């Protein structure tokens, strides 16, 4: 059976924060600027949300919209982060809805962008709104395996048929389980989800070294359900060993 290692993550939240619910953990990250420190104040959501970092991804997303979203469509962006880059990717035929688990972040967003439809939203527990696409960028690698499974299963109970989800390319990597709120590299096509390769990848980050490359997979709801069922079966087998 593939190895799973418990790991604090690439940064460690204080014990008193880890004792709190997930929404309070992400409130702590936002209000203390933990992810924003590296951006020189550009984005409270971290380096991955700067305009420079997202240049390639914004190009890829624009191509996706032009090819596959020719009519009016609703784009549910959860987590939406601080909206630093996404507003530059809005389309005339798009209805944008943003959700984020941090109430503090949502409050700040609403003050800055009162014209945008925003609300607090936990992808693992809250009912998804009516939409055509769920956009889940740079999120799941911050969650424990159990919370990832909850979020993916929760999505499959929605009416949204297409999910855009960030993924690392990590062939033969050991699976790391972290406390929600930390970070590790995550390949959803590996154990324990084994998502099928999607029909389309949107390139996100391609480092010079070629290691830890990122892309967003365009998966169908049925493909995500396949991954959820894999997790349930394989995790049950692990518990019995």
Named regions from a protein language model:
Residues 143:
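Helix-to-beta-strand junctions that scaffold the AdoMet/dcAdoMet cofactor pocket
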Residues 135:
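A conserved beta-strand element that flanks and buttresses the S-adenosyl-L-methionine
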Residues 139:
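Hydrophobic adenine-recognition pocket in adenosine-nucleotide-binding enzymes
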Residues 2-131, 146-241:
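Class I (Rossmann-like) S-adenosyl-L-methionine-dependent methyltransferase catalytic domain
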């Amino acid at each position: 059976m593939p190895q799973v290692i418990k790991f604090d993550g690439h940064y460690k939240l204080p014990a008193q924060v880890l004792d709190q619910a997930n929404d309070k953990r992400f409130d702590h990250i936002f209000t203390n600027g933990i992810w924003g420190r590296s951006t020189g104040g550009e984005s409270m959501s971290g380096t991955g949300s700067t305009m420079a970092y997202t240049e390639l991804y914004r190009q890829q997303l624009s191509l996706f919209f032009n090819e596959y979203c020719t009519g009016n469509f609703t784009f549910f962006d959860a987590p939406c982060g601080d909206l630093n880059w996404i507003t530059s990717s809005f389309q005339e035929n798009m209805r944008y809805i943003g959700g984020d688990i941090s109430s503090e972040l949502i409050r700040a967003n609403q003050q800055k962008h009162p014209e945008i439809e925003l609300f607090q939203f936990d992808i693992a527990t809250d009912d998804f709104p009516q939409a055509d696409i769920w956009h889940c960028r740079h999120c799941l690698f911050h969650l424990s395996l159990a919370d990832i499974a909850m979020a993916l299963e929760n999505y499959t109970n929605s009416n949204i048929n297409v999910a855009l989800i960030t993924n690392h390319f990590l062939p033969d990597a050991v699976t790391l389980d972290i406390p929600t709120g930390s970070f590790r590299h995550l390949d959803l096509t590996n154990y324990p989800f084994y998502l099928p390769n999607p029909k389309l990848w949107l390139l996100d980050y391609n480092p010079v070294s070629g290691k830890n490359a990122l892309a967003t997979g365009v998966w169908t709801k049925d493909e995500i359900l396949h991954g959820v069922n894999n997790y349930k079966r394989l995790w049950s087998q692990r518990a019995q060993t």
